[in-house]
């Protein structure tokens, strides 16, 4: 379906391992992935494991189910500096929508003239 990015989308999960995350509902004062992104849509996500330096940023697909889930389709970055799924341990993880740094345009760039190619390097000089 569509790539959807939304503000204030955040849930928790206790799923361990490298697979699809079971989502535990919206964190206080936030909205759920199903409400903010929508069933079947993809989004950029970040997962952080409480009490550790583990994190993963990627693109995932939201599924409205019991429980709601977020698949980890493409990993963009992680704390190991690779594009592999992080093997999260037991315990709580925070999962939220984000825009990965490699996908963000610098505010000093002119979006009408700047073209990103597969080999582009972004800097404030552009």
Predicted regions and their residues:
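Glycine-rich, low-complexity segments
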Residues: 1-25, 29-30, 67, 76-124
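Elongated alpha-helical scaffolds
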Residues: 53-71
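Ser/Thr/Gly-rich low-complexity blocks that favor extended beta-strand/coil architectures
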Residues: 33-59
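Short, T/G/N/S-enriched strand-turn elements that build extracellular solenoid repeat scaffolds
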Residues: 34, 58, 120-126
């Amino acid at each position: 379906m569509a790539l959807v990015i939304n503000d204030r989308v955040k849930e928790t999960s206790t799923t361990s391992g490298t697979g699809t995350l079971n989502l535990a509902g919206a964190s206080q004062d936030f909205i759920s992935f199903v409400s903010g992104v929508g069933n079947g849509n993809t989004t950029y996500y970040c997962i952080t494991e409480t009490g550790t330096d583990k994190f993963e940023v990627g693109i995932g697909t939201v599924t409205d189910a019991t429980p709601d889930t977020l698949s980890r389709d493409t990993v963009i970055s992680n704390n190991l500096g690779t594009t592999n799924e992080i093997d999260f341990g037991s315990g709580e993880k925070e999962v939220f929508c984000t825009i990965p740094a490699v996908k963000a345009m610098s505010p000093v760039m002119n979006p009408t003239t700047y073209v990103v190619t597969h080999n582009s390097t972004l800097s404030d000089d552009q």
